[in-house]
From Swiss-Prot:
InterPro entries to which the protein is assigned, alphabetical: PRA-CH, PRib_AMP_CycHydrolase_dom, PRib_AMP_CycHydrolase_sf
Provenance organism: Thioalkalivibrio sulfidiphilus (strain HL-EbGR7)
Summary of subunit composition and partner proteins: Homodimer.
UniProt-listed Enzyme Commission number(s): 3.5.4.19
Cofactor(s) in the UniProt record: Mg(2+); Zn(2+)
Protein task: Catalyzes the hydrolysis of the adenine ring of phosphoribosyl-AMP.
Name by which UniProt lists this protein: Phosphoribosyl-AMP cyclohydrolase
Amino acid sequence: MSPDWLDTIHWNPDGLIPAIAQETGTGKVLMLAWMNRESLQRTLETGEAVYWSRSRQRLWHKGESSGNTQRVVQMRLDCDRDTLLLEVEQRGGIACHTGRHNCFYHRYQDGDWQVVEPVLKDPDQMYGDKT
């Protein structure tokens, strides 16, 4: 596979691009993460989402600890070529490290942020005490 397609992406100054994970079938936005060239190549090689963890400064195979992997159905690049959209099958039904289906569980309502999505699995059960 020629790496030329990677050169058409508009990477930020840190060599990253935001990647939105969207659930196939429902169209729900599950999470936003970051990718670099290596994580994007690994994603294509494995068929599963591999992101770049800015906090840990390393590749992060989504679900490597929890088992909640994301099978990539398709990838799209936006019109400015600076944001990726990954259509994924969310295995295990949990995309968020908090144990929720998605990471967007705070809704602005009545002048404050309200939690509107339930915890489906206790993070301690998924990760032990690593959270």
